[in-house]
A protein has these predicted regions:
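N-terminal secretory signal peptides and thylakoid transit peptides that target proteins
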Residues: 1-18
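Short, glycine- and small/hydrophobic-rich beta-strand elements in well-ordered beta-sheets
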Residues: 24-31, 64-93, 124, 131-136
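C-terminal segment of N-terminal export signals and the immediately downstream linker at the start
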Residues: 24-54
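Short, well-ordered beta-strand segments in beta-rich or mixed alpha/beta enzyme
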Residues: 38-47, 78, 85-110
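Short amphipathic alpha-helical segments
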Residues: 51-77, 113-123
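Surface-exposed, polar helix/loop patches in the mature regions of secreted/periplasmic/lumenal proteins
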Residues: 99-136
Length: 137
């Protein structure tokens, strides 16, 4: 085997081993894993310019920055899925799902300078915002 071929082989083998370790590091997938002891904050945004891809991109950029608040455990920025059933509302432009460890972390987020700056810089883009907060029952 030539030196170049050997290097390619070693490089590919290393990447394959790394990919395998990532899969096993996450552990086996569990169906229906329940999130416990968390505070869910789900925000839906309707844009003033509903069809504007530029405004949607700008808001997504702002949400990405907002996701840097230290008390946020996890987040997801999404758009309506291409599903069609009577119970599904796809009229919003973007949603932002946030997981906090507790109510105190969510309360801290409300006054965090990053959150206040987000509202100041991006509020002109939306016409309506609805928030659904939930905790364990």
């Amino acid at each position: 085997m030539s030196l170049l071929s050997r290097r390619k082989f070693i490089g590919h083998a290393g990447k394959t081993a790394l990919a395998g370790s990532v899969i096993f590091a996450t552990g086996p997938q569990q169906a229906g894993k329940n999130m416990k002891n968390v505070f869910i904050h789900h925000v839906y945004f309707w844009l003033k310019n509903a069809g504007s891809a530029a405004d949607q991109d700008k808001l997504a950029e702002g949400l990405q920055k907002l996701s840097g608040v230290k008390t946020i455990r996890q987040y997801h920025i999404g758009k309506p899925a291409a599903t069609s059933r009577d119970v599904i509302d796809t009229s919003y432009a973007l949603s932002w799902l946030v997981v906090f460890d507790n109510d105190a972390d969510q309360a801290s987020y409300q006054t965090d300078p990053i959150h206040l700056k987000f509202v100041e810089d991006y509020a002109h883009l939306w016409q309506k915002v609805i928030v659904y907060d939930s905790v364990d029952r």
